[in-house]
Regions:
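Active-site substrate-recognition segment that forms the wall
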Residues: 51-54, 59, 63-103, 231-234, ...
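C-terminal catalytic lobe of FAD-dependent flavoproteins
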Residues: 172, 299, 340-418
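N-terminal Rossmann-fold NAD(P) dinucleotide-binding loop
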Residues: 21-22
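A conserved short coil-to-beta-strand element within the FAD-binding core of flavoproteins
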Residues: 175-183, 225-239
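Rossmann-like flavin
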Residues: 94-215
Length: 418
């Protein structure tokens, strides 16, 4: 881990060194600000570590809460592998779930699409120069991802969404069974078809990307110190946080704590109505040829992603308390299904990895100034798209902090919208 020269003062302290926080630090640095990055752990070691690695330019439709009763009943009875829930967590999750369901309605869902669009459209264009400057172009898979299915009803819904994607300028290629076999020879020949989304990129090692961004930040004069995010407090006209090198104060502070952001926000008096979708992954050896695209099994709600560590199987959503003990039920249910989809070898990890996706009721991040606290800014709540939206969110926040003209309207992400 690179270290930096200790200091007790800076222009801005960024609290949280996941992919979002590191991007915020870099974008503020590009605006000429002196930035200190603070985290209790190794950068990128928590939520940012375990995703499928997609920088998802084609994901213009946020993950909505199901509306049809048959799907809802199947989820309630734990019949679908795409989701799992803890009974004991439902009472505390209910306000968020109800809000999430309401914002997924035909009346409100278009606002979620419109709000997310600037961050999605600029996802790759904001990441690309950072990747080049950090010298890690080797981590980028340019092949995009493929959605596959086995059932006719799933096929129609997937084709309808692919057609709708064309209105947003996306490249979409519908694949027959034989075309699927050409693109990915290791796939189950019984699949009906698929859709290829080539505009997205995939990172073969998301934590390596975060570490490379951190190194770039340090090379450009930034500083990283381990510290306690929950110690952040107002100190006169400045913000102070306790670090391993003593108290540090800054003119402004950015909270970029992912699923822990709401804890600090609540401590400061903000009610953000957030929930968490936990997810799991496991790496597998390749038996023969490894996939060259991320493959999403839309029928069963999981993805297979080619990684430096092996083939990463990522699960859908688990609705549970963030800090409850891991229950990798979905992973155990999905593995036999995934083995019929693609030829997987042995498990490579001793235990399943688990992370939490921070989710708002309206499927948009919390991004902007904390209205009751001058000099305090929030940037978290990116749900399934933390990696995707990190660099664009960071640019927007840096423009706001530095008083620049913003590339997008920040109103949909404001802190006081709930």
């Amino acid at each position: 881990m690179p270290h930096s020269t200790p200091s007790t003062r800076s222009d801005i302290a960024v609290i949280g060194a996941g992919i979002v926080g590191v991007c915020v630090a870099l974008k503020l640095q590009e605006q000429g600000r002196q930035v200190l990055l603070i985290d209790r752990d190794h950068p990128g070691a928590a939520t940012s570590f375990g995703n499928a690695g997609l920088i998802e330019r084609s994901s213009v439709f946020p993950y909505a809460f199901p509306r049809d009763w048959s799907t809802l009943i199947a989820y309630a009875l734990q019949k679908k592998t795409a989701a799992h829930y803890h009974w004991k967590a439902l009472a505390s999750l209910m306000p968020w779930l109800v809000g999430y369901w309401r914002h997924s309605s035909p009346h409100l869902y278009p606002a979620a699409i419109a709000g997310a669009l600037p961050l999605i459209e600029n996802s790759w264009t904001e990441h690309a120069p950072l990747i080049e400057a950090a010298g890690v172009s080797r981590l980028v898979n340019q092949n995009g991802w493929i959605k596959v299915w086995r059932h006719q009803d799933t096929e129609q819904a997937s084709l309808d969404q692919a057609k709708q994607s064309l209105a947003y300028g996306l490249s979409v290629k519908v694949l027959s069974n034989s075309e699927l076999q050409i693109k990915e020879p290791g796939l189950d020949p019984a699949l009906i078809g698929g859709v290829h989304y080539p505009d997205s990129r995939q990172i073969h090692d998301p934590q390596a990307l975060t570490t490379a961004y951190l190194n770039l930040f340090l090379q450009r004069g930034g500083r990283f110190i381990r510290g306690d995010a929950q110690s952040l407090q107002r100190d006169g006209q400045r913000w102070q946080v306790t670090t391993d090198e003593g108290p540090h104060s800054a003119d402004a502070a950015v909270v970029a704590l992912g699923p822990w952001g709401e804890d600090l926000a609540q401590k400061l008096g903000y009610q953000l109505k957030m929930g968490r979708k936990r997810g799991y992954h496991m790496h597998f050896a390749a038996r023969g040829t490894a996939p060259t695209h991320v493959i999403v099994d839309v029928d069963n709600g999981y993805a297979l992603a080619p990684m430096q560590q092996g083939i990463r199987l990522t699960t859908g959503a688990e609705f549970a308390l963030r800090d409850a003990p891991p229950t990798p039920v979905q992973l155990d249910r999905i593995e036999p299904i995934a083995r019929t989809l693609y030829s997987l070898g042995a498990r490579l990890d001793q235990q399943a990895w688990m992370g939490s996706r921070p989710c708002t009721i309206d499927m948009l991040p919390v991004l902007g100034p904390a209205p009751k606290h001058p000099g305090l800014w929030f940037c978290f709540g990116h749900a399934h798209h933390g990696l995707t939206q990190a660099a664009a969110s960071a640019r927007l926040l840096a423009e706001m902090i530095c008083g620049r003209e913003t590339f997008a309207d920040p109103k949909p992400y404001r802190v006081d919208r709930f």
